[in-house]
Amino acid sequence: MSRRLPLFITLVILHAVALVTAHSQTFYFNDGRKVSLSEVRIKGANIVVSVKLAGTEGGSAELTLPISTLKRIDWPVPAAIAQAEDDLKADKPADALQKVNPLLSEQDPFREVSGSWWTQGAVVKAVALARLGKDVDADVMLELMRRAKADPDAIARGEIAIIDQLVASGKADAAKTRLDKIQNTASDDASLAAIAITKGRIFERAGRTEDALLSYLRVPVYYASENGKMPAALLGAIRALHNLGDEPRAAATLETLTTRYPNSPEAAEAKR
């Protein structure tokens, strides 16, 4: 019994994993039909399904269904998404592009279908292009997202990346114009935190140090759970406090940054 139990448990686990995997790779059509990903191939704007013919030995036929008749798809999370996001965090936009481009090609036919990963990949590409200084290409990506009816918060993330690049390039007026257009469309905390940081940078460039500080501090006050945005906000606050001559608070904020986010690029920059 002691030898059979582990084997039985293993088989149960493998069966459960197989069921989950099968479910997560399924096409659901408007007519109620559902087909496993392994049973189809994509041909242009259609999904070609292999169908076994009853009463024949090994007989099969192909059924062609338009992608437009898809209701949703269950697709496993592509590893390329997380890998490309990690590249962006490490300030490696070119590497992020290399990882996300194949994913976008794969997901492109399903860009408007619920469950597709195209929008997430498109956001990564827009951000990467913006950070590489390719604002026009990033704008093209955002327009594709709009046509695909992407979530406004996803579009806002790409917009913010372009705006950040404009600020870094000294084009503060153009950055402010674009920022004013998206402030009322973003609703998620990540986008709102990013907007606060970007506004802080615009104020900083304009010499409005107190306004910059207040904008940076909105992140720890209102969006404290956004750990991905916190290092940039704290670094901006440190710069502002230095410029205001408030060295004790600057030192305390530096301690917070280096203690809570020791491996962040912002912590390394703050120590220089």
Each language-model region and where it sits:
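Compositionally biased alpha-helical segments
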Residues: V20-A150, R157-A168, D173, T177-N184, ...
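Bacterial N-terminal signal peptides
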Residues: F8-A18
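Extended low-complexity acidic/polar segments
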Residues: L144-D153, A224, T256-A267
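Conserved positions within tetratricopeptide repeat
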Residues: L97-Q98, D139, D173-K176, E210-L213, ...
